[in-house]
Curated annotation (Swiss-Prot):
Residue intervals of the sHSP domain: 41-156
Protein name: 17.8 kDa class I heat shock protein
Family as reported in the entry's similarity comment: Belongs to the small heat shock protein (HSP20) family.
Any Pfam family: HSP20
Highest taxon listed in the record's lineage: Eukaryota
Keywords noted in UniProt: Cytoplasm, Stress response
Induction per the UniProt record: Accumulates after heat shock.
Compartments (UniProt record): Cytoplasm
GO cellular component: cytoplasm
CDD domains: ACD_ScHsp26_like
């Protein structure tokens, strides 16, 4: 048996029904991976993923917030230099006599902060939300285009 994982799909361990380590079994320590405040029920929303890209014109932030409404999300500028994206999602719990087999939708609060560079226009920040993706655009200050300067030097002698 090889201890090196296969990156090409030839991992014999995962295909063997006789290998006890390849079976999906109950793991008594699985619940210890997260503190109780970050249980599986809330961890997806508390770990909101954000991409930050810089273009020639702006800094663009994209946050995946599946299932959230724009009313549940706040975009703020703190201290004229920090972009804060936060929100909270509540899951409506039905108290019926139904038998639940799995509950995986997440709820809870999240907050992400990003220190912005000095070359941005804080008063022109825009945010939009479409299909569970929040896009925040922070325009950059146009830098004065440097003109090529030519200075003639007198030659003495």
């Amino acid at each position: 048996m090889s201890l090196i994982p296969s990156f090409f799909g030839n991992n014999r361990r995962s295909n063997s029904i006789f290998d006890p380590f390849s079976l999906d079994v109950w793991d008594p320590f699985k619940e210890l991976q997260f503190p109780s405040s970050l249980s599986g029920e809330t961890s997806a929303i508390t770990n909101a993923r954000v991409d930050w890209k810089e273009t020639a014109e702006a800094h663009v932030f994209k946050a995946d917030l599946p299932g959230m409404k724009k009313e549940e999300v706040k975009v703020e500028i703190e201290d004229d230099s920090v972009l804060k994206i936060s929100g909270e999602r509540h899951v409506e719990k039905e108290e019926k006599q139904d038998t639940w087999h799995r509950v995986e939708r997440s709820s809870g609060q999240f907050s992400r902060k990003f220190k912005l560079p000095e070359n941005v226009k804080m008063d022109q920040v825009k945010a939009s939300m479409e299909n569970g993706v929040l896009t925040v655009t922070v325009p950059k200050v146009e830098e004065a285009k440097k003109k090529a300067q030519v200075k003639s030097i007198d030659i003495s002698g």
